[in-house]
Amino acid sequence: MNISDIRGLSDTEIKKKLEDSHKELFELRLKLSTRQLVNHRELPRVKNDIARILTVMRERELQIR
């Protein structure tokens, strides 16, 4: 997910996306611990998505953009 895609979402959609990403990260960590995770590249991707979402939320809080 690109940061420009996130900026195009409303605040409620962003919060929902953040919640979904946290759930996905939890599930991926669970699969990793049970050795069921096939694509290890998914973990950093989800973490980066969460960071992007939090960045946009902070920008809106500070009214930077």
From Swiss-Prot:
Gene Ontology molecular function: structural constituent of ribosome
Alphabetical list of Pfam families matching this protein: Ribosomal_L29
GO term, biological process aspect, one: translation
InterPro entries in alphabetical order: Ribosomal_protein_uL29, Ribosomal_uL29, Ribosomal_uL29_sf
Keywords: Ribonucleoprotein, Ribosomal protein
GO cellular component: a single term: cytosolic large ribosomal subunit
Spans through the membrane: none
Keyword Ribonucleoprotein attached: yes
Record has tRNA processing as a keyword: no
SUPFAM superfamilies: Ribosomal protein L29 (L29p) (SSF46561)
Membership in a protein family: Belongs to the universal ribosomal protein uL29 family.
Name of this protein: Large ribosomal subunit protein uL29
Species: Dehalococcoides mccartyi (strain ATCC BAA-2100 / JCM 16839 / KCTC 5957 / BAV1)
